[in-house]
Amino acid sequence: MWRVCARRAQNVAPWAGLEARWTALQEVPGTPRVTSRSGPAPARRNSVTTGYGGVRALCGWTPSSGATPRNRLLLQLLGSPGRRYYSLPPHQKVPLPSLSPTMQAGTIARWEKKEGDKINEGDLIAEVETDKATVGFESLEECYMAKILVAEGTRDVPIGAIICITVGKPEDIEAFKNYTLDSSAAPTPQAAPAPTPAATASPPTPSAQAPGSSYPPHMQVLLPALSPTMTMGTVQRWEKKVGEKLSEGDLLAEIETDKATIGFEVQEEGYLAKILVPEGTRDVPLGTPLCIIVEKEADISAFADYRPTEVTDLKPQVPPPTPPPVAAVPPTPQPLAPTPSAPCPATPAGPKGRVFVSPLAKKLAVEKGIDLTQVKGTGPDGRITKKDIDSFVPSKVAPAPAAVVPPTGPGMAPVPTGVFTDIPISNIRRVIAQRLMQSKQTIPHYYLSIDVNMGEVLLVRKELNKILEGRSKISVNDFIIKASALACLKVPEANSSWMDTVIRQNHVVDVSVAVSTPAGLITPIVFNAHIKGVETIANDVVSLATKAREGKLQPHEFQGGTFTISNLGMFGIKNFSAIINPPQACILAIGASEDKLVPADNEKGFDVASMMSVTLSCDHRVVDGAVGAQWLAEFRKYLEKPITMLL
């Protein structure tokens, strides 16, 4: 056999001394005698025979026969490389796909299937957080989950990275129990037989990065990306205490992102064993361990002194001490600056009739056809959780709504006693400052103003509200949104974005509406405003504005937009100039309406009209002055003749 092998591989220098080793191995007592391979030599000679696998094949290696005497002897002769692809059952390596046009990497938010589970075609395998949203990753064929290679919460997984292994038969799952990505890597030839696992395991070296090695089974909960632009967050409030039981869908903490304060929910049942980041801690980087969750209540005490290095330096930030007043008065404590241990509620109760519900509970309620107004929430501030939906028994009489808690905000602080107060800068306020500064410094703004006769719109609005009485209420701002969207279709240059290398002209009009909240300015989006009726727009605006003020907006509801409207007319502001919201090219500033004398074809020669002043801020890189004027002309035409919005 060796002569056949050596003859075919005679041009391979690394194998020159193998004949002597082959003979020596066969002399070892107890080693089975292996004769030359029977049968004719292979007819095909076009395969590569200069590599490890090629020489093994020429020497009679038979992968299908498993651990035969011949195979064991060849492994000792050639040096085993460890487990290789062809030594495993048939399987499929599942790579991370591109789930958005601009996606370069993703985060495994949650695995929907566990190792050993059967996967049917169309089943959701995992939820992957892209640069745009969290997207479900579905299976394209029937199979079984053999091995998960990328753990939940792993961030910045590049596209194409292998995230799991699937097999066609359930009996093949066991073969991948210890499979790792390194298992299929090209091995380094070994000069001796593979040692036993006990011999290869080196003693663990002390490392502060592995504090959980001597702890009971547990899960580190990392700070996730709760908005596409989030790089860090502030732990506003912990809704659970150490030792409390956690159920799927329970609100764990309130996290302040760069856009809003968002509830962070529990994905699975367990017990809160340790809080690693205290309330009020600011600028916590993404991926930082926030807390420890265990499956068994008895394991909680083991984590009393748990201290991972990632969070040892994270402490609640206290505002700089306020200098004492100049006047000679007895020094008094400064109660105005909120301490991290007792922050203001991140999410004040909403107006009468508002239902607080977790996303998971809301989804289950829709599936079961449950009216959320009839469900009594047992979560924080009356929040409805998954447990409430599961235990809900429908009744004919809906329970009385919970008492409305008066909203509290940053302004409702104790009476000042010094000459000034230092207010900590929130993440939202910091981002607003950065973006507005960037806009004014990098975008060449110019401004165009025009007066619009609102008489016809006011008449149409009055008639429509009579028709919709008890169903919806349309505002003047809803007509403005509709007219703006239609004007953007007429003058698409105003519905464009500066993208550094190109000007992107958008084919749909998503109108961002500026809303003032206690936390700062935010711009929820009325999507596809150009094809929606004013009633639908009115309902969208009311819903979005309410969610914005309560900090309940989801990232996709305020990220994006192609055109922005800012309305200060309700405050009596006659006119103002707004700052462009990049990468958009325009923003429309709406002033108050006031009665003015205008020329008219009547006996008096004049009439009294309700005139509204608007100012369009334009990016001169995208919209030239004449183009901006054309847009305002179209906008005024739609409002002064609202019937044309039906064309």
Swiss-Prot record:
The keyword Acyltransferase applies. One of its GO terms (biological process) is tricarboxylic acid cycle. The active site is at 620, 624. It is an enzyme of class 2 (transferase). Residues 91-167, 218-294 form the Lipoyl-binding domain. PROSITE patterns: BIOTINYL_LIPOYL, LIPOYL, PSBD. Its cofactor is (R)-lipoate. Residues 197-211 have a biased composition (Low complexity). SUPFAM superfamilies: CoA-dependent acyltransferases, Peripheral subunit-binding domain of 2-oxo acid dehydrogenase complex, Single hybrid motif. Its EC number is 2.3.1.12. The modification N6-lipoyllysine is found at residues 132, 259. Transmembrane segments: none annotated. Part of the pyruvate dehydrogenase complex (PDHc) that is a multi-enzyme complex composed of multiple copies of three enzymes, pyruvate dehydrogenase (subunits PDH1A and PDHB, E1 component), dihydrolipoamide acetyltransferase (DLAT, E2 component), and dihydrolipoamide dehydrogenase (DLD, E3 component) to which is added an additional protein the E3-binding protein (PDHX, E3BP). In terms of structural architecture, the E2 and E3BP components assemble into a 60meric central core with icosahedral symmetry. The central core is decorated with E1 and E3 proteins. As part of the pyruvate dehydrogenase complex, catalyzes the transfers of an acetyl group to a lipoic acid moiety. The pyruvate dehydrogenase complex, catalyzes the overall conversion of pyruvate to acetyl-CoA and CO(2), and thereby links cytoplasmic glycolysis and the mitochondrial tricarboxylic acid (TCA) cycle. This is Dihydrolipoyllysine-residue acetyltransferase component of pyruvate dehydrogenase complex, mitochondrial. It comes from Homo sapiens.
